[in-house]
Amino acid sequence: MSDNELTERLLSGDRRALARVISKIESEDPEASDIISELYPHTGTALSVGFTGPPGVGKSSVIAKLIELYREEDKKVGVVSVDPSSPFTKGAILGDRIRLTEHFLDPGVFVRSMGSRGHLGGLAGGSQLAGLAMEAYGVDVVVYETMGVGQGEVEVASAADTVVLVLQPGTGDSVQALKAGVMEIADIFCINKSDHPQADGAAHEVRQILDIGEELESQPWFPPILMTRGDTGEGIQELKETIEKHRAHLEESGELEKRRRAAQRELVISWATVRLEREMQERLDREDTELMERVYNRELDPISASEEIFKEV
C-alpha cells in the first residue's frame, strides 16, 4: 500500500491504516515523515488529556471509566499508553491487552501501547505523533497515559491540553510527586481508590502542598482535588466535567493557544534532536577508526571531536 493510499484510508476512518501509520511512527520509518506531513492539517481539534502518576495508582481503570462516559455521548476516543520497553525488543511489555480490555471491540475506541524505548520522559518519543494520527483519524478525545517514571513525567504536559495527576492514598505519592516536579504541571488532582481510609488525609496533604505554592494561588486556574474510584466509576463524572471546565478556561483565557504553540515548539525540537543524534551516531560509526582513534589516543578531546562532527552535519 502506497503512502498516499495509507493516508487516504486513515482520513476516511480506516482503523488498520491508523495502526500501520502508528507502527511506522514508532519504528521511525522514513516514510512516516511524509505521512505526518499530509495528516497534520487535519489535526488540532480534539480534546487532549494526559494522565500521569506513580505506577499502580489505577490510572488505567480511571481512564476506562472515563471512556465509557465519552462513548455514551458517541464521542470517539484514542488512547496512547506508554509502557516500559523490553531491553531486548524495545517493544511495550505490558501491552494493550492487559488494560482497557473492555473497549477493544468498540469501534469508537482506539487503544495503542507504545514502548518507552529508553526515552527519558514519561512519554515515548513518537507518542505525540501517534496522538496526531489519531486526531486525523477522527477521534474527539486523545488520552495520553504515562508509565510513571518520576521526574520525566513533566513531558506529558507538552503533549496534552489538560494534565490529570492520579495519586493513591497511604503511599506518600504526593510527596514523591512534589519532589519530581510533577505537582507543578497538574491541572487536576485525582485521589483514586477513595474508599481507602486514608483518602481524605491524602487530599488534605495535596491541598497543603498546593497552599504552599504562591505561584499556583495567583493563577486563574487553581487545580481542584477530586476523589474517584476507578473500580466503580464513583467520581468519574465529576472528573469529566472538570476536564471540560478546564478546556473552557483554556479557550476563554487564550491559554490553549499558548500551550499548543509551546507543545509544537517542543515537538520540533524533540524530533530535530532525534535526527541530529542519529546522524551523529552514523558519522561516528563511519569514522570510528579515524576520529575516535584520535580521541582514544588523547590527540583530540571529546568537545573538539563533537565540533568536527557538527561541521559535517
Question: Where are the regions a protein language model picked out?
Answer:
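P-loop (Walker A) phosphate-binding loop of NTP-binding proteins
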Residues: 54
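Long, well-ordered amphipathic alpha-helical subdomains in the mid-to-C-terminal portions
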Residues: 227, 238-313
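Conserved beta-strand segments of the P-loop GTPase G domain that flank and frequently precede/overlap
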Residues: 113-114, 165-168, 190-193, 227-228
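Short acidic active-site motifs
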Residues: 152, 178, 235
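Canonical P-loop GTPase G-domain recognition
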Residues: 188, 194-249
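Hydrophobic positions on the alpha1 helix immediately C-terminal to the Walker A/P-loop
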Residues: 62
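Nucleotide-state-sensitive switch-loop elements of NTP-binding domains
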Residues: 2-49, 57, 66-152, 159-166, ...
